[in-house]
Amino acid sequence: MRMFDVQGVEIVASRQKVFEFLRVPGNLTRWAHAFVSAGNGRARLETPAGAIDIALEVDADAEAGTVDWRLTFPDGGVGLAQSRVTETTRDTCIYSFVLHAPPVALEQVEGALDAQSALLRSELATLKSLMEP
């Protein structure tokens, strides 16, 4: 059973520009579809299944180019996502994203991860369009 998915996108923008955008929690609302608000250690997610307020920790390291998120749900469940922005020799950067299976019952993991993986592809395309000239 798959417990994670890794996706990436090449973006015609500097590593610094993309990293600086990603490290700001409030920008999640511009590219991560479920986020309707984010900031000050909190976020609100809305999906077809409903809305929920969560704790949101962001760990960003400019030198490494990493931006990692820890989402803590009211029931104590924890969701993780790790990402990295790397530069290329083509005046572009590559943004890679590790999506972990959500904190749901094991029998729901595969379907939930498949759905989130499809959504992530769309979100990465949105991010790319926001960052490119």
List PLM regions with ranges:
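Beta-strand/loop substructures that line and gate deep hydrophobic ligand-binding cavities in soluble
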Residues: F73-S122, T126-P133
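Generic recognition of short, well-ordered alpha-helical interface segments
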Residues: A13, R23-G26, D53, A118-S122
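Hydrophobic ligand-binding cavity/cleft-lining segments
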Residues: M1-A38
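Generic structural detector for well-ordered beta-strands
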Residues: G8-V12, E57, R84
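An N-terminal domain-start capping segment
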Residues: M1-R2, A49-A51, A125
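Glycine-rich portal/gate segments that line the openings of hydrophobic small-molecule binding cavities
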Residues: N27-L80, T88, I94, L130-P133
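Short beta-strand-to-loop capping motifs
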Residues: I11-A13, T47, L71, A101
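Conserved short-loop catalytic and cofactor-binding motifs
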Residues: V6, R42, Q108-G111
